[in-house]
């Protein structure tokens, strides 16, 4: 009985560890087959005979992103949806460009920890813990900062020049929950009475905020 109990504990511990990040690959590669209708916590593998170097290559992060938008920033993702060779490998990247004063608004990555490296500029960055503690710092060219998995975080260009970072994730598809857009531009919309109660503001204020995120006609 003791041996069985120990074995059960080992199995449970292993299962818990396995779910802490993307599952380990069980083969050398599993290039995503975008044409397959089968989706089991990832993409199906395309035949090994059809795999080429292009499946593992991308120039997505070469060009600066257009930052002439509401927040003054643009995230260019290099994840499994853009690079099929990342399937099952548990990593991805992104380039984030910021106009002067630009903001990557408060958001979370439900499936990954993020680490950023500043290519150009200076940024105010931070994350908020589950006890509502703000952990923040100003980072400059050549410096790095880590945002723990699932915690709300942000980056803001505090300078007069454009800024750029490269971000790394321990997931092939980290996912992004943009807090302002999630709450005020969801489809179907979050009920006004939920937002008025949550933010202790009136319906007119909620409608005004929603109008700022509505698609431009």
Curated annotation (Swiss-Prot):
| Disulfide partners | 30-45
Q: How is it modified after translation?
A: Glycosylated.
InterPro entries referenced in this protein's UniProt entry, alphabetically:
Cupin_1 (IPR006045), Germin (IPR001929), Germin_Mn-BS (IPR019780), RmlC-like_jellyroll (IPR014710), RmlC_Cupin_sf (IPR011051)
Q: What is the protein's major site of localization?
A: secreted
The compartments listed are:
Secreted, Extracellular space, Apoplast; Secreted, Cell wall
Annotated GO MF terms: manganese ion binding
Q: What family does this belong to?
A: Belongs to the germin family.
- GO CC annotations? apoplast
Q: What is this protein's function per UniProt?
A: Putative receptor for bacterial rhicadhesin, an attachment protein of rhizobiaceae.
User: The Cupin type-1 domain covers which part of the protein?
Assistant: 58-207
Give me the glycosylation sites of this protein: 50, 68
The chain's coiled-coil residues are: none
Q: What is this protein called?
A: Rhicadhesin receptor
* Superkingdom in the source lineage: Eukaryota
Annotated signal peptide:
1-20
* Positions of Mn(2+) binding: 107, 109, 114, 153
Pfam families the record matches: Cupin_1 (PF00190)
């Amino acid at each position: 009985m003791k041996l069985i109990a120990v074995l059960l504990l080992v199995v449970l511990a292993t299962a818990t560890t396995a779910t802490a990040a993307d599952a380990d690959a069980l083969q050398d590669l599993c290039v995503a087959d975008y044409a397959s209708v089968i989706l089991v916590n990832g993409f199906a593998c395309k035949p090994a005979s059809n795999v080429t170097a292009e499946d593992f290559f991308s120039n997505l992060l070469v060009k600066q992103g257009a930052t002439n938008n509401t927040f003054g920033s643009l995230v260019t993702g290099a994840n499994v949806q853009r690079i099929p060779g990342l399937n099952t490998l548990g990593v991805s990247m992104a380039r984030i460009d910021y106009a002067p004063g630009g903001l990557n608004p408060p958001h979370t990555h439900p499936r990954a920890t993020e680490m950023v490296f500043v290519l150009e500029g200076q940024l105010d960055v931070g994350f908020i813990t589950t006890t509502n503690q703000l952990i923040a710092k100003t980072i400059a060219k050549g410096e790095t900062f880590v945002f723990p998995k699932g915690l709300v975080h942000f980056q803001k260009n505090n300078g007069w020049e454009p800024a750029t970072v490269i971000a790394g994730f321990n997931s092939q598809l980290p996912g992004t929950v943009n807090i302002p857009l999630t709450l005020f531009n969801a489809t179907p919309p979050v009920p006004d009475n939920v937002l008025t109660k949550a933010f202790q503001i009136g319906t007119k204020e909620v409608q005004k905020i929603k109008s700022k995120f509505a698609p431009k006609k």
